[in-house]
Amino acid sequence: MLTIGGKQFQSRLLLGTGKYPSFEIQKEAVAVSESDILTFAVRRMNIFEESQPNFLEQLDLSKYTLLPNTAGAATAEEAVRIARLAKASGLCDMIKVEVIGCSRSLLPDPVETLKASEQLLEEGFIVLPYTSDDVVLARRLEELGVHAIMPGASPIGSGQGILNPLNLSFIIEQAKVPVIVDAGVGSSKDAAYAMELGADGVLLNTAVSGADDPVKMARAMKLAVEAGRLSYEAGRIPVKDYGTASSPRDGLPV
């Protein structure tokens, strides 16, 4: 069970809702993923314009928790303003803080992310900041009181997978709040690996929406997250330099 800000969720897979080939494919992929939490960019949604298409109308919202994000923000002030818009729409008081510091790499701005998170916490939001795999920054965010930490595996949409498993392991080891690996996941292998490292969840979008078959990939991600979590809980065998026979010779008659 994944718990964020006092809310409990069965699925540890958080799914983004952007860039699907069609509303129909998006809806089917969401259903197959069995995700409880769907994230979307407030700036790309027509939450106040009824005459414009809105993917939220295609879903049974009673089945999901919506996680608006502040994608497009370059400063703390912009992120806070976007978060307030999302809250004013009545969708949710949970917000993914995303403040991009580099338009080419799409890496987050650590200073502005800290500032935005602090302000939104003061305003009563459930705050989930998207951050780099900086171990110290993750600790600083937790000290502020954020409800989860979302370190990137690699740049957003890059599909490079987990580039720095050591740092992610350090973040997971020290954190007292959920750690959700976010960004850069390219395949089910990456999702399973993140969970095997001990992450509490995985958030992804492009890996599903950009796949040749988004619906099939959504199912693959669901199974990968479940398998990775089970593997972590089971406890893997230690890595050794040399082989160890699985059938011991002690006590054999010959």
From Swiss-Prot:
Gene symbol of the encoding locus: thiG
Source species of the chain: Bacillus velezensis (strain DSM 23117 / BGSC 10A6 / LMG 26770 / FZB42)
This enzyme's EC code(s): 2.8.1.10
Family: Belongs to the ThiG family.
Gene Ontology molecular function, alphabetical: thiazole synthase activity
UniProt subcellular location: Cytoplasm
Protein name: Thiazole synthase
Any GO BP annotation: thiamine diphosphate biosynthetic process
Catalytic site: K96 (schiff-base intermediate with dxp)
GO cellular component: cytoplasm
UniProt keyword annotations, A-Z: Cytoplasm, Schiff base, Thiamine biosynthesis, Transferase
InterPro entries (UniProt xref): Aldolase_TIM, Thiazole_synthase_ThiG, ThiG
